[in-house]
Amino acid sequence: MELGNFVTDLNGKKCVKCDKDAKFTGVDPKKAWYCQECFVQMVRNKFRSSLSKKKIYKDADARDTLIVFDGTLSGTFLLHQINDALKQITYKRLMVKPTVLVLVSLTEDTEIQMVIKRIQEIKKSVLENVRWVVAHLACSMYDEDFKLKENECNGVEKISDYNQLIASCSVPTYRKELERVLKEKCLQKIACSMGILKCMVPDHADDLGRLAIDQLCLGRGGSISTLVTVTDKRPDFMLIRPLCDISKKELAVYNYLCDIDKHCIHIAQQNNQQKSVQTLTDAFICTLENEKFYSTINTVLSTAAKIHNTSIGKDDSKCSFCNVEVADSVCSTCSAIRECTGDLLTLLF
């Protein structure tokens, strides 16, 4: 039987948590099946567990957190989890002081204005008493402190510089990696400009599993643990990935069942998919999943979490651009990216 685009099964399966008929499954349909109520609770528990295990908010003075909303199904899920957690009046209440960052990569002014208008509507029903800020990925190009304004898209004056830098990278693989690193720099600069030390991003398990393989191919195998696990601590900034154990499929089913996918909006620029390490990784994972190797992502992530760099970076030396542990000031991948950009990257950073 099909419910929307989500596979269900009514042929005698029982929920693993209660005695009701099971209709929904997680990543692997050969394993646990759930009724609707237990499936929703299972996904919520994964989110809360990722935060509680690391005791991220044990310090009462460091609860200010930037919540990144990128318009995707995972971004929508994250937004609603924070909203629900703040409404709790028991021990389940999440002790966090959120500021929502709407991260945009669109370049047309009319599209950006439509996003701002849509955000005004969403704010009426989700986190209405929280500060919202709209910013473009081009904020990564600021070389000095800047003040964020409300009710407008910050960083639009830097879009041409951002596009010029991305276009200057001639190798598709390095271009995609440059975009990823610039996104992290954008988040860090925005957080620092607001005096916030923590940033919660909507990266789900599928994204992180693919990222782990990408980074192996780019020669960063010793650093993939920090890139795909819950916390990524940096000198003045921490990235938090509370969706790292939740698959894209689970998020899609949850959003559908809870009727929150209506808050997904188009924020990201669609780029031409030239052949690169990243596109090949995606094709490789899709092939395995189509051949019913459902646990591929889980296996990759569980293995990646155990890999730690023991030969270099013992003195906490980091790449000055991407922040991975290296023996030198710049990792080999970032050095290659700098060469591809014709030294434009060196001039800017």
Curated annotation (Swiss-Prot):
GO terms for cellular component: cytosol. It comes from the Eukaryota. GO terms for molecular function: nucleotidyltransferase activity; sulfurtransferase activity; tRNA binding. Pathway: tRNA modification; 5-methoxycarbonylmethyl-2-thiouridine-tRNA biosynthesis. It is found in: Cytoplasm. PANTHER family: CYTOPLASMIC TRNA 2-THIOLATION PROTEIN 2. This is Cytoplasmic tRNA 2-thiolation protein 2. The lineage of its organism: Eukaryota, Metazoa, Ecdysozoa, Nematoda, Chromadorea.
